[in-house]
Amino acid sequence: MRRLSSWRKMATAEKQKHDGRVKIGHYILGDTLGVGTFGKVKVGKHELTGHKVAVKILNRQKIRSLDVVGKIRREIQNLKLFRHPHIIKLYQVISTPSDIFMVMEYVSGGELFDYICKNGRLDEKESRRLFQQILSGVDYCHRHMVVHRDLKPENVLLDAHMNAKIADFGLSNMMSDGEFLRTSCGSPNYAAPEVISGRLYAGPEVDIWSSGVILYALLCGTLPFDDDHVPTLFKKICDGIFYTPQYLNPSVISLLKHMLQVDPMKRATIKDIREHEWFKQDLPKYLFPEDPSYSSTMIDDEALKEVCEKFECSEEEVLSCLYNRNHQDPLAVAYHLIIDNRRIMNEAKDFYLATSPPDSFLDDHHLTRPHPERVPFLVAETPRARHTLDELNPQKSKHQGVRKAKWHLGIRSQSRPNDIMAEVCRAIKQLDYEWKVVNPYYLRVRRKNPVTSTFSKMSLQLYQVDSRTYLLDFRSIDDEITEAKSGTATPQRSGSISNYRSCQRSDSDAEAQGKPSEVSLTSSVTSLDSSPVDVAPRPGSHTIEFFEMCANLIKILAQ
């Protein structure tokens, strides 16, 4: 689950009413499609042409609070350049003093997730067609140094002709390697073993694993790794053993096993998949066009000029990046994007101009078991640019670094905040966990392992989602020692372990102070408990122990 910022009022100077609806630029905003970290996604309609778009609204205050201004400014320009038939396009960015509106491609077919839930598994031919489209989009972004890291059927949309469109490319670029699990609010069913175990990973290989899970879902209508008990689910993923129905083609089984290799070094690459016999069958040429742009020594003058105009830089800067083969530099990425866009538009012209849909989904099979529950949300993209969003930071202050985002696992409630925290304290006491009250809505909890005598630690924090709903967020704090040493927190000596009455009393005092309801119920934690901490490495899996604590607590609270 995610921490949701309050929906703030936007400046009236840039926003107008149109027949009772909000108008941004030439777009009239309609219903809300989803809610994400920085704001909402709404459907929009161009007042002149009538074309529908999806408008993602990024809240400026939320962006500043997460210290990602620089990342968003540098990435938006390149995401605007992304032009691939199977990736959701970003058309325009409109700014107001309080919000940023990203005008994106709207598709009417809904999520692939919903389609599978409604219709069940697809036949092999249709599964291959959609998987080829998805992998083409993944390959396109990997070649331009962007990794998705949260691929799943919820992030694959379907257009009116039942073609796949990948959404939310670019989100992961605002996060450091190895940190994405703590920021992801999606289901862990699609996560690679190295992600859920907290090991470092380069990036592309986790997209391969997730693509393999999607392929399995297309073919079988279920997931290869699934369990209601999260620790058991994690064990299944890390073991990499999954059931293969008898109706599956042996050729596709071999591909699935190669893509779902636990060892990332043995896992299939995109090149391996493209060379697989099952994948190559009926493969449209436009999905993987020849790519001479990287090996060519010739410079495209038109592309060079366009990069200079968009980034307000000199030709020498761009040429320096190209000649030094610094492909990760935003200037080089933009140059190659422009080259690729031109080539793909030429080679896929028939695709863009097609007026008749491909063969419809004709499979009559249905889901044999329900899909894992998910939280409905849309994640805000974070593309690269140099000048598009300078107004985000008029003082152009330098940030000290990206604040570490948190992964949210929790439960929702419509009870009063003090009642929620009182029940939490009772549950903790019943489980014989130890806890400390950091503030009325933030607890730090630990459990002693009777076998190893080591402690598993977690934090519980309450947030307000909307006017009636609250989110109790669970977070592992096994990294507290590292944070303290790195200076991200100021350790102070802990007092005695807090009891239930202190939690309830503090909560009542906080309510009496009249805290504003539109923000989270507590401020950021700035100190850590330094009472006897375990500096020595602990055996076993911290992640599994954390989820066991979560499961035990949720079980008590649900009684």
Curated annotation (Swiss-Prot):
Changing residue 183 to E: Hinders activation. Ubiquitinated. The AIS (autoinhibitory sequence) region shows some sequence similarity with the ubiquitin-associated domains and represses kinase activity. Belongs to the protein kinase superfamily. CAMK Ser/Thr protein kinase family. SNF1 subfamily. PROSITE patterns: PROTEIN_KINASE_ATP (PS00107), PROTEIN_KINASE_DOM (PS50011), PROTEIN_KINASE_ST (PS00108). It catalyses: L-seryl-[protein] + ATP = O-phospho-L-seryl-[protein] + ADP + H(+); L-threonyl-[protein] + ATP = O-phospho-L-threonyl-[protein] + ADP + H(+); L-seryl-[acetyl-CoA carboxylase] + ATP = O-phospho-L-seryl-[acetyl-CoA carboxylase] + ADP + H(+); L-seryl-[3-hydroxy-3-methylglutaryl-coenzyme A reductase] + ATP = O-phospho-L-seryl-[3-hydroxy-3-methylglutaryl-coenzyme A reductase] + ADP + H(+). The modification Phosphoserine is found at residues 356, 360, 397, 467, 486, 496, 508, 524, 527. Catalytic subunit of AMP-activated protein kinase (AMPK), an energy sensor protein kinase that plays a key role in regulating cellular energy metabolism. In response to reduction of intracellular ATP levels, AMPK activates energy-producing pathways and inhibits energy-consuming processes: inhibits protein, carbohydrate and lipid biosynthesis, as well as cell growth and proliferation. AMPK acts via direct phosphorylation of metabolic enzymes, and by longer-term effects via phosphorylation of transcription regulators. It is found in: Cytoplasm; Nucleus. GO terms for cellular component: apical plasma membrane; axon; chromatin; ciliary basal body; cytoplasm; cytosol; dendrite; neuronal cell body. Low expression in kidney, liver, lung, heart and brain. Residues 27-279 form the Protein kinase domain. It comes from Rattus norvegicus (Rat). This is 5'-AMP-activated protein kinase catalytic subunit alpha-1. Its main location: cytoplasm. The keyword rRNA processing does not apply. One of its GO terms (biological process) is regulation of circadian rhythm.
